[in-house]
Amino acid sequence: MSVKINGIEFGNELFPNNERIFKSLPWQICAQNFIRVDFKYQTDLDIWKLIVAKKYLDDKFNGTVIVLNMLYVPYSRMDREIEGYAFSLKYFCDLINGLNFHQVKVLDTHSNVTEALINHLYKINVQDFVDKVIEKENPDYVFYPDSGALKRYSEAIKLPENIGVFYGNKQRDLNTGKILKFELINCPEDIKDKNVLIVDDLCSKGGTFIASAELIKNVGAKRVCLYVSHCEDSIFDGKILKTDFIDMVYTSNSINRSGSSEKIYEFCI
């Protein structure tokens, strides 16, 4: 599922030439004052399906309140102008704004740049999900992989007073993406046999989190778990699920994944 209208899948069939088939919906599905469009990005094709869905709804149900539920915002990594690259996040957000949804619901954007670029934005509170993980894992410390995550989550979530905080610093080869160096900043002296929860917004293959967890366990931590709001399918290609550095991954259902693992616990939104 990549696009649903009030729970009904839209545009999932194909003509022989691979063009999408967009069937009209039963009028009863949208015979109300509110329509919810759920959008889960997998490929750029899904963006086309979203465009057709909104244009169709505008034609057939003009005047109805239409809300976009887009928990993960595509292209959120490209949140600044970088020489040699197109500012793709801005152009994607321009497209969403042009569709003129009454409200756009998102979860844990990669940066405040995304929030500034999308009109009629509603942020789902990440605090609720972090609280659930804390209740399950009872961590002694929360670890943020970099200073950006430290700043973002220090403002977005409130931790119990008994949970300490430290963070990481990494040097990355911008051409290859490979992590060249990783270090722990303000690592607590009493971390031996303690539980640590890593918190961030997005996981792909998880190289940063493996580097973090390996160092944290090497200095004596007993258990290291990870909370990410968005977990891409590529986690199955990385080392997180194949090694013992990270004991459990907590995430949302914001992105479709082709597989499953006993080490992944999913919150449904």
Residue ranges and their predicted role:
Residues 1-269:
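PRPP-associated nucleotide enzymes
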